[in-house]
């Protein structure tokens, strides 16, 4: 997969699908997940509907630049945040969501794309929101999927989902792949597919196993704060999609996002958790195609 320099110290790995002459759609993935989490079949199906689809690895993930020179001790970081020692927490994390948003926009620049439709899932939704807030002239439309506003009162995880998210991941391939089945904790209750979760985990492990980046991405997310006031002023056409089965980011996160952004459309999806089950792809793709028309 190709990679391009988006700044003096960051290169981003990406893959594109479809005709470059079609309207560009940038897919932004979430916390700790590689571009593979935007399934290739999903990307091709969206491209077949007349969109030029670009997926990419965020910094500190996949084949993009790693920040090994800034190790984060998760225990110390969580203790600092929990105790309110934000100066100490801030000093541990080398970047914020704004930097991750700049990476995505830098990728578009490197590809010669001035403006694009931006679709972000989970933390990727937060990054996509930040793109639209920081450079609205470059974002044709925003689709914020299974995400939230950065306000602590909305989009909270259930204790069960949080326990799975922060459980230590096995370092060996077999253990890592087996543990992925536990992500059913936040998946669609109807369509949750442990085999598909393990298949993605195996592909991700083989491509670029890199647990060290998770702490820095978490820090960027936690320390970037609330976007609520800024979202009230956003004028980019916005679609908010959230699964009603989501226990990792409660649907209140999506509802709140749509409440804040003037004119935003809210699509609450039954039988969808913090995932994109293949059975729901037609509905999700229809929604994105309609919003980006």
For the regions a protein language model found, what residue spans apply to each?
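Catalytic active-site module of serine/aspartate enzymes centered on a nucleophile-bearing elbow/loop
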Residues: 264-293
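Short beta-strand/loop motif that positions the catalytic acidic residue
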Residues: 234, 240-242
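Conserved HGGG/HGGXW glycine-rich cap/lid loop of the alpha/beta-hydrolase fold
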Residues: 8-87
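Flexible "cap/lid" loop of the alpha/beta hydrolase fold
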Residues: 142-171
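Conserved acidic catalytic loop of the alpha/beta-hydrolase fold
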Residues: 86-87, 91-94, 98-116
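Conserved alpha/beta-hydrolase catalytic His-Asp/Glu region
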Residues: 175-216
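Conserved hydrolase catalytic core segment
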Residues: 114-153
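Acidic catalytic loop of the alpha/beta-hydrolase fold
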Residues: 245-249
């Amino acid at each position: 997969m190709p990679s391009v320099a988006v700044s003096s110290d960051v290169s981003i790995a990406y893959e594109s699908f479809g005709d470059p002459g079609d309207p560009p759609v940038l897919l932004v993935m979430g916390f700790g997940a590689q571009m593979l989490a935007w399934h290739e079949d999903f990307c091709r199906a969206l491209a077949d509907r007349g969109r030029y689809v670009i997926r990419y690895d965020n910094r500190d993930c996949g084949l993009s630049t790693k920040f090994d020179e800034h190790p984060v001790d998760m225990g110390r970081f969580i203790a600092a945040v929990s105790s309110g020692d934000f100066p100490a927490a801030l000093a541990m994390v080398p970047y914020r969501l704004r930097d991750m948003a700049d990476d995505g926009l830098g990728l578009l620049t490197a590809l010669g794309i001035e403006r694009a439709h931006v679709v972000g899932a989970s933390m990727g939704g937060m990054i996509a929101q930040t793109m639209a807030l920081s450079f609205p002239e470059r974002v044709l439309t925003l689709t914020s999927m299974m995400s939230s506003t950065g306000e602590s009162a909305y989009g909270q995880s259930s204790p069960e989902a949080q326990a799975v998210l922060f459980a230590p991941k096995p370092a060996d391939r077999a253990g890592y792949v087996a543990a992925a089945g536990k992500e059913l904790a936040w998946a669609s209750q109807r369509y949750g597919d442990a085999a598909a979760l393990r298949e993605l985990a195996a592909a991700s492990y083989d491509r670029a196993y890199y647990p060290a980046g998770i702490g820095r991405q978490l820090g960027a997310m936690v320390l970037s704060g609330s976007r609520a006031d800024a979202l009230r002023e956003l004028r980019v056409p916005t679609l908010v999609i959230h699964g009603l089965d989501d226990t990792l980011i409660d649907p209140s996160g999506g509802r709140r996002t749509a409440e804040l952004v003037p004119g935003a459309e809210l699509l609450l999806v039954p039988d969808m958790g913090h995932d994109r089950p293949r059975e729901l792809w037609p509905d999700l793709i229809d929604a994105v195609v309609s919003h980006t028309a």
